[in-house]
Amino acid sequence: MTVDKIALVTGANRGLGRSAAVALATRGVRVVVTHRGDAAGAEKTVEQVQAVGGTAAVLRLDISDVPSFASFTSELGAQLERWGTSRLDILVNNAGVGVFGPLETVTTDDFDTVMGTNVRGTFFLVQSLVPLLAQGGQVINVSTSLTRHTSPATSVYSASKAAVEALSRTLAAELGPRGIRVNSIAPGPTATDFNGGAMRDDAGMRQALAGQTALGRVGEPEEIGDAIATLASEGLRWVTAQRIEVSGGALL
């Protein structure tokens, strides 16, 4: 029996994660979507996947809870078996958090939450799931254009994503002998519900940022999802250890 490729997309109950799941499904990939507590949002993602003819399953995952990864890996393995395989082909590390504020307002708890989720969680989830990744599989870590340009009050978030990009390059070297490639996708200003939906809902913010992009607008979630799905395709099988920015030419 021929089994479709299978992807795990973390934080796929909304925003970029949902768009990535749907874009992958459009290309014939089965998708496991995770959420931290928004089961309804995850089910909506499943509905959208099914609407494009895809197949999806839902698992709960708190990316900041590293000790839970062992049981999560077992649950994922059981889902893969239900689909007739033991392999995972694509891991999209999308789940993350952001705390934004000037230097004097950031607390140690804020710092630890962002680093513990975005860096520690991402690293140890890859470590946990590598045994399931097939020869020729891949990891795509979601970063941000803020690792290239600066914006006030984003220091902790952008630093966490810079660490993710460094991890991506190093892990690409470590996992390359197994045929596993690792890349990072760096979205620019995008109209999602991240950070309370500020980019999506604040017309003034969108207009200001649109004026700083080569293409004259902010991005849409579907455009990031398409970029992730394209990077996951066989057509880009020779690409690894790269940071690919998807920003419409923001802040050149």
What residue spans do the PLM features occupy?
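Conserved glycine-rich cofactor-binding loop
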Residues: 13-14
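Conserved glycine-rich Rossmann-like NAD(P)H-binding loop of the short-chain dehydrogenase/reductase
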Residues: 29-44
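Substrate-binding pocket helix/loop in short-chain dehydrogenase/reductase
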Residues: 102-103, 107-112, 205, 209
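Active-site loop-to-helix junction immediately N-terminal to the catalytic Tyr of the SDR YXXXK motif
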Residues: 106, 150-158, 170
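Active-site helix of classical SDR
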Residues: 126, 160, 168
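Alpha-helical segment proximal to the catalytic Tyr-Lys
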Residues: 131, 173-177, 237
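Short C-terminal tail/terminal secondary-structure segment
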Residues: 149, 229, 236, 240-252
